[in-house]
């Protein structure tokens, strides 16, 4: 119950792109991102440190790095345009910043899909305080 309350509070601050990212993950994987990825291992959700625990956590690490390269953009807030054609995610629009944000999210959603088979339930709701190794470089 405490986790659901925390998720509800966090959602109050979710705007634009993060909600789109949630939808993109849901469409790609069929999983509910808030319960599947929000508190997964060391890099999924807010913040990140230590060594990624598995392939799914590495998807989140790479996504964080991708956002980190977009210094002139607001990746957590900017709304972008995308569509799904067959099973492909297609980023659209004319704004280069928004398109790059979409591409970061697309890569993560596809990464999650490709690693569904190695998703480890033991890392769901993982305490970030256990992520003590040195973080790899992007």
From Swiss-Prot:
UniProt cofactor(s): Ca(2+)
EC number annotated for this UniProt entry: 3.1.1.4
Gene3D superfamilies: Phospholipase A2 domain
CDD domains linked to this entry: PLA2c
Molecular-function GO terms, alphabetical: calcium ion binding; calcium-dependent phospholipase A2 activity; phospholipid binding; toxin activity
UniProt keyword annotations, A-Z: Calcium, Disulfide bond, Hemostasis impairing toxin, Hydrolase, Lipid degradation, Lipid metabolism, Metal-binding, Platelet aggregation inhibiting toxin, Secreted, Signal, Toxin
Any Gene Ontology biological process: lipid catabolic process
Cofactor note: Binds 1 Ca(2+) ion.
Any one of the GO CC terms: extracellular region
Coiled coil region boundaries: none
Binding positions (Ca(2+)): 43, 45, 47, 64
Stored InterPro entries: PLipase_A2, PLipase_A2_Asp_AS, PLipase_A2_dom, PLipase_A2_dom_sf, PLipase_A2_His_AS
S-S bridge residues: 42-131, 44-60, 59-111, 65-138, 66-104, 73-97, 91-102
Known function: Snake venom phospholipase A2 (PLA2) that displays edema-inducing activities, exhibits indirect hemolytic activity, and inhibits ADP-induced platelet aggregation. PLA2 catalyzes the calcium-dependent hydrolysis of the 2-acyl groups in 3-sn-phosphoglycerides.
Protein name as annotated: Acidic phospholipase A2 2
Lineage start: Eukaryota, Metazoa, Chordata, Craniata, Vertebrata
